[in-house]
Amino acid sequence: MAAACALTAAVTLLPLSHGAGDGQGEAGGRSVARAVTARADTCEEPERSLRPSTADGPAIEKIKARGKLIAGVDQNSFRWGYRNPATGDLEGFDIDLVRAVAKDILGDPDKVIYRAIPTNQRVLALREHKVDVVVRTMTVNCSRIKDVAFSTAYFQAGQQVLAPKKSAVKGYDASLAGRKVCTAKGSTAYDALAAKSFGAKFEGLTVSSQLDCLVRLQLGEVDAVVTDNALAAGQAAQDPAVELKGEPFTQEYYGIAVKLGSDDLVRRLNHVLDDYREGGDDGPWMKAYGKWLKDDLPGIEKPPEPKYRDN
C-alpha cells in the first residue's frame, strides 16, 4: 500500500480556475434545447445521441476562435486521466480521446487546455462555461441528460465493490451490512447506495474524487469503496492489497458531456467517435484500450455501438 500512497501523493491538482484573462473565454453555447428536457422526462435509452455531423455551429466556432479546446478531466484516475509521476504529463484513456477531439476540430491534438474537476463539479463546469467538454468517465443516465448533453457512448462500465483482499466483504450484497463504504460526491455509486445500501454506512463518507476513496481504504477509515468497475480496476492496479469483489451490479455508459444546447458540438463529437471506433484492433479505440485498460479490464473485444436519435 505504501507504493500506492506514494503515487497518490505525487499527483498535484490542476485548478479549475474561475477567472478570465488567460485566453480561455466562455465555453460552449448558451441556449438550452427543450427537446432534450422532454426526452429526459420520458427517458428509456439515455445513451442515444444526435447523429454525427462535421458542420460548424456556435459552439464549434467559439472553440476555433479561441484556438484551444477546454476539456474538463480527471487527473487522479489511474489509466483514465492521471498525471504521470515520472514525466508530469496527463495520460490515460480519456486524455487520448480529448486529444482526438482537438485534432479533429483544431487540427492539432496539443491544442487543449486541461481543467481538473471533481466528480460533483462536472455539470457546473459546463453550465458556467468553464469547459467545452467533460471527458471524465461520466456516466450517461436519465437524470444527467436533464442537465447536460452527451455524445454517444465511448465505454461500457458497471458499478462494483472494491475492498481489501482479506475482507469479508463479498460484493454488493448483505456482506456490506454495518460496513463503512466510500463513494464520490455526485457519482452514480452514491445513487446506487442511496437506493439500496444493504445496511452499509455511507452517508458522510463521500469524497470529491474516487482516488480519495482508495486513500481512505488504505488508511482503514472505510471498509469498502463502490465505484465504476473501470475505475476500481485502476485503483486495484495501484494497490495489490485490494481487489474487485463480486460482479458489476449495473450497466452504464460513459459519454462526453457538453452544455445543453450545444448540438453542433455533440454532432461533431459523434463524428469524432465514429472515426475513433473504426479500424478494429488497429483502430484508435482498440489501441487506446490495449495501452491503458486491457491489463486491468481484459476481455473487451470492441467499443460500444453508437445509438442515435433524430432530435
What are these regions (language model features)?
Residues 30-54, 167, 187, 256-296:
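Extended ligand-binding regions for polar small-molecule ligands
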Residues 56, 112-124, 169, 205-215, ...:
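Short helix-initiation/N-cap motifs at beta->coil->alpha
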Residues 121, 137-146, 218-251:
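A ligand-binding cleft/hinge motif common to bilobed small-molecule-binding domains
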Residues 155-163, 233, 237-273, 295-311:
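Periplasmic-binding protein-like
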